[in-house]
């Protein structure tokens, strides 16, 4: 399984250790998204930055859409299925399946590891960006509902 992690809050007033963890996750700016494997190391990092990001399990269909719509190659070149087939030797669905299953990491592909997303259409949840998802906000773990947020942000 793989997590999609999206940075929600900015960098003003962030403690140094949390800023370092966000940097290790490659979440430098708001609305940036990374796909990470579900390991104990990453889970600990997510717990540390839970007040600045939201995350959940991404499904294959959403990852395919994310790669095709917001994926970029070095030089900020757009991605299409033919380019992915040519560079990786597999189609987009197969690539997404392997990323989700943890067989390959996104950084091992020619794609950039960070997806730059738009702010969500119709905004975040009613509670805003300072409350956890469990009480109606936007932060922290949200499970399968990350796919709905990603759809709003693509």
From Swiss-Prot:
Its GO biological process annotations read:
maturation of LSU-rRNA from tricistronic rRNA transcript (SSU-rRNA, 5.8S rRNA, LSU-rRNA); translation
A Pfam entry, by short name: Ribosomal_L30
Q: Which SUPFAM superfamilies does the record associate with it?
A: Ribosomal protein L30p/L7e
Key word Ribonucleoprotein present: yes
**Keyword Cytoplasm (UniProt):** no
Q: Which GO terms describe its cellular component?
A: cytosolic large ribosomal subunit
UniProt GO molecular function: RNA binding; structural constituent of ribosome
- Read off the Gene3D superfamilies from this record: 1.10.15.30, Ribosomal protein L30, ferredoxin-like fold domain
Query: Please, which domain of life does this record's source organism belong to?
Result: Archaea
Q: Which UniProt keywords apply?
A: Ribonucleoprotein, Ribosomal protein
Q: Which NCBIfam families does the annotation name?
A: PRK06049.1, uL30_arch
Task: Name the family.
Answer: Belongs to the universal ribosomal protein uL30 family.
Listed under subunit, the entry gives: Part of the 50S ribosomal subunit.
Q: Could you tell me what this protein is called? A: Large ribosomal subunit protein uL30
Species annotation = Methanocaldococcus jannaschii (strain ATCC 43067 / DSM 2661 / JAL-1 / JCM 10045 / NBRC 100440) (Methanococcus jannaschii)
